[in-house]
Each structure stands twice: as C-alpha cells, then as structure tokens.
Design a protein with these regions (language model features):
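Short loop/turn segments that flank or connect secondary-structure elements
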Residues: 1-170
Length: 170
C-alpha cells in the first residue's frame, strides 16, 4: 500500500531492535536516530519512530511527493501494513486503508504480506520484552547518579533545586 493515508496521520510508528539493527547495517541509523523514541502510552516503554512535537505524520514520509524516504528499508510494521498478526491469527489492522479491495493480489504477494506481519509481530514481542528491562536499568542508573550528585551538594544548593522543582509544579 502506498497511498500515504496511514503515513500522513500516524505520529508514532512501532519499531523493533531488528529494524534498528538493519538500519545500522545499511547506514541509515544516524539519519533516523533523532526520531527514535520511547512511547509510554500503553504503560510499558515501546520503541517508536516519532514525529517532532507539533508535526503530523511519520517523520520519514515526504507528504509533498507522497513517498516514504526509507521505502526500501521501512520498519517491519510498515512492511506488513495493513495486515497484522497477534500470535494466533492474521487480521486487517486498518479497515479504512484505501488499498483494501483495490487491484489484485496473487498467492506470492499474500505470502510476502503474511510473512511481513509475522516478522513484525515476532520482532516487536522480542523488543517489547527487552525495552522495559533496559529502560529500568538506565533509569535506575540515572537515579543513582542523581543521588550521588545530591550527596555532594551543599544545603544551599539543595534548597535551590527544591525551589526550581516547586516553580515547575506551579
């Protein structure tokens, strides 16, 4: 599907460690890293390719030319779109997709689409298992570093930080 409907609206595209490793291998990661983030919407950290604040659509979508800038190496989620897999069955994740019911699909194309949906599912399961652990390790380390820094501060410096935090809350 290459109509751009999904690409121009989605603000956070799920990505996996497999996507990131492939982009590193293919020399694309440096250009994408500023758009890779962590989404906490579901309660657990998930890797995403996201637009900058205030921008709409996938950051890799060129809305003027209606093209994906990384079409040759797009995220697994995009390769499978609009097909998804949940571990037991395949389903259409976006029934509003303009490509549904348009043209024909042969057995080989269907197999490719199904494989992409399964690859996306498996890669995201792996990433979604590891990201929360890595997030916890990194956040724990940051808290420890902050605590150690606070131990070396004077009472006056600590009071200044508390004042700043109070101002931020108001």
């Amino acid at each position: 599907v290459s109509c751009g409907q999904y690409c121009s609206k989605i603000e956070k595209v799920p990505v996996s460690f497999q996507d990131i490793a492939r982009w590193r291998k293919n020399g694309l990661l440096n250009g994408l890293v500023q758009n890779i983030g962590i989404d906490m919407a579901g309660g657990f950290p998930q890797l995403v390719l996201e637009s900058k604040e205030g921008e709409k659509g996938c950051p890799m979508y060129d809305s003027e030319n209606k093209l994906c800038q990384i079409h040759h190496d797009m995220p697994l989620n995009c390769q499978a779109y609009p097909l998804s897999y949940n571990g037991s069955k395949y389903f259409v994740s976006d029934k509003a997709c303009q490509g549904l019911g348009q043209g024909s699909m042969d057995a080989e194309q269907l197999k490719t689409q199904r494989d992409a949906a399964m690859n996306d599912y498996e890669a995201r399961i792996e990433s979604n298992t590891l990201v929360p652990m890595l997030y916890s390790i990194i956040m724990g380390d940051l808290v420890d570093q902050s605590r150690k820094s606070m131990e070396h501060m004077t009472e006056e410096q600590k009071a200044q930080i508390q004042d700043i935090v109070k101002e931020e809350k108001n």
